[in-house]
């Protein structure tokens, strides 16, 4: 299976989050020596790389985590745009309805839906609301499926 990894899980480990870091680290480390793979899309890659001081350190970090770069296909970007349009049109928040720039989580969810079998994230509610067909795995709630 291919698991897309959300930024919050990488940050849990990178910043040694006292509440979520251990469960995220344990979950990700279970993928060593398996046929399963971990991937991260462009958005996650950009968000996580911003937390590192240099390109080489970031590359080592992602390699150590066993997470491969998986670029966003145009079909996923278009799907994200359609779901974002729906979210804007159904929102009760005027600021959301007027916002034109897409929220990154829509891109992350659409990428996972099209390029992976599941998304590893702690943002279960959002992903389940907007990506009902996406299998969501919360490392703080479950062991590797």
Q: Residue spans of the language-model regions?
A:
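Short, hinge-like loop/turn segments at secondary-structure boundaries
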Residues: 55-59, 87-89, 137-140
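Conserved beta-strand segments of alpha/beta enzyme cores
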Residues: 37, 66-68, 135
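A generic structural signal for short hydrophobic patches within well-formed alpha-helices
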Residues: 10, 45, 77, 126-127
């Amino acid at each position: 299976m291919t698991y897309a990894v959300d930024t919050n899980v990488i940050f849990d480990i990178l910043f040694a989050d006292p509440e979520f870091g251990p469960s995220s680290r344990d979950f990700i480390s279970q993928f060593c020596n398996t046929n399963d793979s971990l991937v991260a899309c462009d958005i996650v890659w950009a968000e996580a790389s911003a937390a590192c001081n240099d390109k080489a350190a970031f590359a080592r970090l992602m390699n150590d985590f066993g997470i491969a770069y998986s670029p966003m296909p145009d079909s996923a970007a278009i799907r994200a745009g359609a779901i974002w349009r729906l979210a804007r049109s159904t929102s009760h928040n005027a600021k959301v309805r007027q916002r034109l720039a897409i929220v990154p989580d829509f891109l992350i969810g659409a990428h996972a839906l099209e390029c992976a079998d599941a998304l590893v994230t702690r943002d279960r509610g959002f992903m389940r609301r907007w990506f009902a067909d996406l299998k969501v795995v919360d490392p703080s709630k479950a062991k590797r499926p």
